[in-house]
Amino acid sequence: MAAPLEAQDQAPGEGEGLLIVKVEDSSWEQESAQHEDGRDSEACRQRFRQFCYGDVHGPHEAFSQLWELCCRWLRPELRTKEQILELLVLEQFLTVLPGEIQGWVREQHPGSGEEAVALVEDLQKQPVKAWRQDVPSEEAEPEAAGRGSQATGPPPTVGARRRPSVPQEQHSHSAQPPALLKEGRPGETTDTCFVSGVHGPVALGDIPFYFSREEWGTLDPAQRDLFWDIKRENSRNTTLGFGLKGQSEKSLLQEMVPVVPGQTGSDVTVSWSPEEAEAWESENRPRAALGPVVGARRGRPPTRRRQFRDLAAEKPHSCGQCGKRFRWGSDLARHQRTHTGEKPHKCPECDKSFRSSSDLVRHQGVHTGEKPFSCSECGKSFSRSAYLADHQRIHTGEKPFGCSDCGKSFSLRSYLLDHRRVHTGERPFGCGECDKSFKQRAHLIAHQSLHAKMAQPVG
């Protein structure tokens, strides 16, 4: 009986040993699975961010694919709302970091917002040269020194990285080198396409090629605009951390015909900071005549319309009477009529005059009876949208105008102005008969009716 008991006593130990091995094995498998999931999640994030509408057929398929990619990235079936929010905030946090800090932090692959913040704080404590300057290898330095002419453009940023020399095999098939040079860290993989008139692959991440002032002058305005559109769009996508894979972006780059004369495959390219790119763009981009241009998407270079709006923000037109400034001469002319009393716009129905044509148009609604603004709740119509907005507060109960003295709220601004006279004691409506004053016009009218009755003969 003792032997079986000893066997029973030893059995749990052996079982525990087996269990320990299984637990460790399971833990290793979980870590491996998490690593694979992390890589798959990052790939889905990049595919989600660079998804192109033109890659699918129709809006339904586009929305479905975006939904699937987003779910694969964020994994809502596994993560809580807080974890999903942290992923989104972490991505945006990395996006808004300065370029050099952003690149270094992305290389560390932070898994949480706290980790990313800690990396940035640690980086800021280090000497600037320790992380901003990328020291080339001993073999690459003399090779770079023996290359041809330097790239034309703004000076390189501190820590600008040089792409290693293009292997000779890439040039063996043709005497003409690629017009665009690769730029970035060694070992990066970038999508390539073929540019019209250029032999050999050209990386879509290689838009920072450069023009001298003479070469820039040979480009027509359309080519210059296309250059800046592609360059800025590529810069935005590079900042977000993914390449350009959409066919629409590839076809856009293929339209970039001009190749820099005299530029060879041995030219050295350097990266720009956003500030230097903006400065060089402002110097080299011509002050062309401002025409109608479609509004730009976020992240695209400023359009002529935006430039025109920026120039107008200076408000060069000043009123000689009160000193008020205006962006446009027409606004100044309209304003000056408040000083002169001029009313050039006359109503053909009643000969009433108005300072602006818009006031005349609103007045003519009185004669036509037109009331184009209808309330969806009760069907009541109004001649002005402002009247409709005031009326709709009856249904919603909204009272947006509050008194700063007592906190009472009102649905109309005029009601608030009448109420404030209770606090200020103002009585702007005076009677011409007895010099009595009133806070509201209605009270004055009621008072004047008393004078009218008293003036009537008693009969």
UniProtKB/Swiss-Prot annotation:
Coiled-coil residues: none
Disordered as annotated region, ranges: 128-188
GO terms for MF: DNA-binding transcription factor activity, RNA polymerase II-specific; RNA polymerase II cis-regulatory region sequence-specific DNA binding; zinc ion binding
This protein's GO CC annotations: nucleus
Keywords recorded for this protein, A-Z: DNA-binding, Metal-binding, Nucleus, Repeat, Transcription, Transcription regulation, Zinc, Zinc-finger
Domain KRAB, residue spans: 202-292
CDD domains, sorted: KRAB_A-box (cd07765), SCAN (cd07936)
Statement: the UniProt record of this protein carries the keyword Hydrolase: no
Stored InterPro entries: C2H2-ZF_Transcription_Reg (IPR050717), KRAB (IPR001909), KRAB_dom_sf (IPR036051), SCAN_dom (IPR003309), SCAN_sf (IPR038269), Znf_C2H2_sf (IPR036236), Znf_C2H2_type (IPR013087)
Pfam families in the record: KRAB, SCAN, zf-C2H2, zf-H2C2_2
Stretches annotated zinc finger (C2H2-type): 317-339, 345-367, 373-395, 401-423, 429-451
Domain SCAN box: 45-126
Tissues where the protein occurs: Widely expressed with highest levels in testis.
One example of a Gene Ontology biological process annotation: regulation of transcription by RNA polymerase II
Record's subcellular location: Nucleus
Protein's job: May be involved in transcriptional regulation.
Assigned protein family: Belongs to the krueppel C2H2-type zinc-finger protein family.
Protein name, entry field: Zinc finger protein 213
Origin species: Homo sapiens (Human)
